[in-house]
């Protein structure tokens, strides 16, 4: 298979990864993933006050469980959703987000899969832009893993490695929810890809010196 065809397949893989995650972002019920409310709240607070929240003033141990995390994803999600209007808050931190719980959640096997009600892209758009931000980071992780595999084992192996990661149900699920796990995956994949680049470049340099 030619290099151009491998590159085209890699682009298709990344496009499918992003499409699957975005579909999950809008199909998944709001707050259906663990700690999504706390993660989303962190993003919204950053938009409300225009900076990182003052963690020393956190009034809830539950909120602090997420707010002590590194702000990489939360900052990226807040910037990605800048086009979404958010009412500013003079308090730092602002009061916790209140969402109406679904009293019939999981009460019947046929439905009631929404933990909360009256939450959708129209009235809570920042939640969905934050989910799409996670999807983008998921694509970045797949791209970095593909690059690492390609450098070591060739383009076909890189595609296989990227595909295995991209289409894991858990990975797609995380890519469609507000969480701080996707940036960790992306950073680890990028570091691994860069390490592979350094090792292979150094190996080629040593081989060239021996030939000389």
Please give the residue ranges for each predicted region.
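Transmembrane signal-anchor helices characteristic of membrane glycosylation enzymes that use polyprenol
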Residues: 6-37, 48-63, 86-90
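Transmembrane-helix signature of polytopic, membrane-embedded enzymes
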Residues: 8-10, 90-91, 97-117, 121, ...
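Hydrophobic core segments of transmembrane alpha-helices in multi-pass, intramembrane catalytic enzymes
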Residues: 39, 45, 138, 180, ...
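Specific aromatic-rich, kink-prone transmembrane helix
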Residues: 143-147, 183-203
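Membrane-interface junctions at the ends of membrane-embedded or membrane-associated helices
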Residues: 1-5, 150-152, 196-212
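Interfacial juxtamembrane loops and adjacent helix segments
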Residues: 45-133
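Short helix- or helix-capping micro-motifs
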Residues: 16-17, 161-166, 193
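Short acidic/glycine- and proline-prone juxtamembrane loop motifs at membrane-interface regions
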Residues: 170-183
């Amino acid at each position: 298979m030619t290099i151009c065809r491998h590159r085209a397949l890699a682009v298709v893989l990344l496009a499918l990864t992003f499409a699957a995650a975005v579909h999950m972002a809008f199909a998944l019920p709001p707050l259906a993933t663990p700690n999504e409310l706390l993660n989303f709240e962190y993003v919204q607070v950053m938009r409300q006050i225009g900076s990182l929240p003052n963690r020393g003033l956190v009034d809830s141990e539950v909120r602090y469980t997420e707010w002590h995390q590194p702000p990489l994803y939360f900052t990226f999600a807040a910037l990605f959703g800048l086009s979404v209007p958010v009412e500013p808050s003079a308090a730092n931190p602002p009061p916790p987000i209140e969402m109406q719980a679904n009293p019939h959640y999981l009460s019947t096997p046929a439905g009631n899969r929404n933990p909360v009600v009256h939450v959708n892209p129209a009235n809570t758009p920042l939640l969905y832009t934050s989910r799409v931000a996670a999807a983008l980071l998921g694509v970045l992780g797949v791209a970095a893993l593909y690059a690492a595999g390609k450098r070591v084992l060739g383009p076909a192996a890189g595609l296989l490695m990227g595909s295995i990661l991209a289409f894991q149900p858990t990975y797609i699920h995380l890519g469609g929810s507000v969480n701080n796990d996707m940036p960790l995956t992306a950073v680890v994949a990028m570091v691994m890809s860069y390490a592979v680049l350094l090792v292979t470049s150094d190996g080629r340099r040593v081989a060239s010196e021996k030939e000389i």
